[in-house]
């Protein structure tokens, strides 16, 4: 950093201190703010709580300050909600007031400052994007159109694992093959395309760029520059890398997928009844002037991240828990055999006949929630919540993981026990009918991908348990389930090596 930049930073720091003190006094008179640790000028609570605002750290703060608390992170207000009643207020009762998305220096790059659907503010653009994405992605018709493809992809995973001699002895990182499956599941829907193998050069490049995008976006290491603008010059290299990754991804999306589909469409005359895949519907909306070319790419961006990775994390968590709980794995296998018959492979229409499989999925989503803090919400205007004033443009986090793991709300929540969803919690569903359990959120900004995720989880987990005895690698009693939390993600820290012994069907 040159001398001029240092001088400017120090001048900005002095000005910000004066402004912070003034605003703090003004707001102290105006607002009845939620409780929280006492902030200091400029940095707020950042020096006290640091960058790592994962679900467990926020749970510890909730135990100290209550079901709603405020963190002043530099110039940003961060309100954390940790009770079902307040979650209902944010997501349902006051869903319009808290229906926007907060800004973030990194997500601003990856979403073009909200040109996508997931991270845009609540309003006309969001309604338009949600409508355009719903028909080709998030309906029962889509499930029925693509379910046989999902079943074929799961069958291919089973075949490939059986062919790998290491799988039944020393074990394999099965996640790698499942990642290819998930890309194929979603790229069938998006582009009527699939990748033949893990070594496909285009798949390798796409996976690498998407992985780097997720790492950069979910990391806590850029928080200081996002919260405290005077420190943003220190993020220059980080943000430059984000821009480079975005440009490479979008060029790849455009050259190899969107433009290829355009060329195919130009050689055929297709009306709406002949549109084969999601991108056809989206390009049709662009041709009608409803969205622009950039919006098309941001939709592809959303699906590449939100639909693929989150479902993959949940599959990986489910496998790890079944390996570590062989009695649950055996009970699930017994249900599959007794309900479907020996050797009969589970299909999507079978899922409603398999309550224990559904309970295993629900329990995985409860204990190992892929998005434990949901996607952050924001109020565009001053609002009220829990008897407190919430200043405009506050970032609102719903700690959905704690809602589903609070011992005051659940019986022995630390245990992986699918039976709870067949016994005392039998009426609780993943669609948000109970505000203690919100793996996909609820309300206007809930995740529409639930309609795809649940059947894919059921087919994949069911087939793996039918065809293999899933075990930890030699010399280990269990696989490591240490968590890796992100800005609002939760995945397993170390991708597990799993022994998959083929079963005689």
From Swiss-Prot:
Membrane topology value: Single-pass membrane protein
One example of a Gene Ontology biological process annotation: biosynthetic process
Signal peptide: none
This enzyme's EC code(s): 1.14.14.91
Keyword Transcription among record annotations: no
CC annotations in GO: membrane
Transmembrane segments: 3-23
Cofactor: heme
Record-listed (E)-cinnamate binding positions: 213-218, 306
Sorted UniProt keywords: Heme, Iron, Membrane, Metal-binding, Monooxygenase, Oxidoreductase, Transmembrane, Transmembrane helix
UniProt superkingdom: Eukaryota
Similarity section: Belongs to the cytochrome P450 family.
PANTHER family: TRANS-CINNAMATE 4-MONOOXYGENASE (PTHR47948:SF4)
Entry function: Catalyzes the first oxidative step of the phenylpropanoid pathway in higher plants by transforming trans-cinnamate into p-coumarate. The compounds formed by this pathway are essential components for lignification, pollination, and defense against ultraviolet light, predators and pathogens.
Protein name: Trans-cinnamate 4-monooxygenase
Organism per entry: Zinnia elegans (Garden zinnia)
């Amino acid at each position: 950093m040159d001398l001029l930049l240092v001088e400017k930073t120090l001048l900005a720091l002095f000005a910000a201190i004066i402004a912070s003190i003034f605003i703090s006094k003004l707001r102290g008179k105006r607002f009845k703010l939620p409780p929280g640790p006492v902030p200091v000028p400029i940095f707020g609570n950042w020096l006290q709580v640091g960058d790592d605002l994962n679900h467990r750290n926020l749970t510890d703060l909730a135990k100290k300050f209550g079901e709603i608390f405020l963190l002043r992170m530099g110039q940003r207000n961060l309100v954390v909600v940790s009770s079902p009643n307040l979650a209902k207020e944010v997501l349902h009762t006051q869903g319009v007031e808290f229906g926007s998305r907060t800004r973030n220096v990194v997500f601003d790059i990856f979403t073009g400052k909200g040109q996508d659907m997931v991270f845009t503010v609540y309003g006309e653009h969001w309604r338009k994007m949600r409508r355009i994405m719903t028909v080709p992605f998030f309906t029962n018709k889509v499930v029925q159109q693509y379910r046989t493809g999902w079943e074929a992809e799961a069958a291919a995973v089973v075949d490939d694992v059986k062919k790998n001699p290491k799988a039944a002895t020393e074990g394999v990182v099965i996640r790698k093959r499942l990642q290819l499956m998930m890309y194929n599941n979603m790229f069938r829907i998006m582009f009527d395309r699939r990748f033949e193998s893990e070594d496909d050069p285009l798949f390798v490049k796409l996976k690498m760029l998407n992985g780097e995008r997720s790492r950069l976006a979910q990391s806590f290491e850029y928080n200081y520059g996002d919260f405290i603008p005077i420190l943003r010059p220190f993020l220059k290299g980080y943000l430059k890398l984000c821009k480079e990754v975005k440009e490479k991804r979008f060029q790849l999306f455009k050259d190899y997928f969107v433009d290829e589909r355009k060329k195919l469409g130009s050689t055929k005359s297709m009306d709406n009844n002949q549109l084969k895949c999601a991108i056809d519907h989206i390009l049709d909306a662009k041709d009608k002037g409803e969205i622009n070319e950039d919006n098309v790419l941001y939709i592809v961006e959303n699906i590449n991240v939100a639909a693929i990775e989150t479902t993959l994390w949940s599959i990986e968590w489910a496998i790890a828990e079944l390996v570590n709980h062989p009695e649950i794995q055996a009970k699930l296998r017994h249900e599959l055999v007794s309900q479907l018959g020996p050797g009969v492979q589970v299909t999507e229409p079978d899922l409603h006949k398999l309550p224990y499989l559904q309970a295993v999925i629900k329990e995985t989503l409860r204990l190992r929630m892929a998005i434990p803090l949901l996607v952050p919400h924001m109020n565009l205007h001053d609002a009220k919540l829990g008897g407190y004033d919430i200043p405009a443009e506050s970032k609102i986090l719903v700690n959905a993981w704690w809602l589903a793991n609070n011992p005051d709300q659940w019986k022995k929540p630390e245990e992986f026990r699918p039976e709870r969803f067949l016994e005392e919690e039998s009426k609780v569903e993943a669609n948000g009918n109970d505000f203690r359990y919100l793996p996909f959120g609820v309300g206007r900004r809930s995740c529409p991908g639930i309609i795809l995720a649940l059947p894919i989880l059921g087919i994949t987990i069911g087939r793996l348990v039918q065809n293999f005895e899933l075990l930890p690698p030699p010399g280990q009693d269990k696989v490591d389930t240490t968590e890796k939390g992100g800005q609002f993600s939760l995945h397993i820290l170390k991708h597990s090596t799993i022994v998959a012994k083929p079963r005689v069907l």
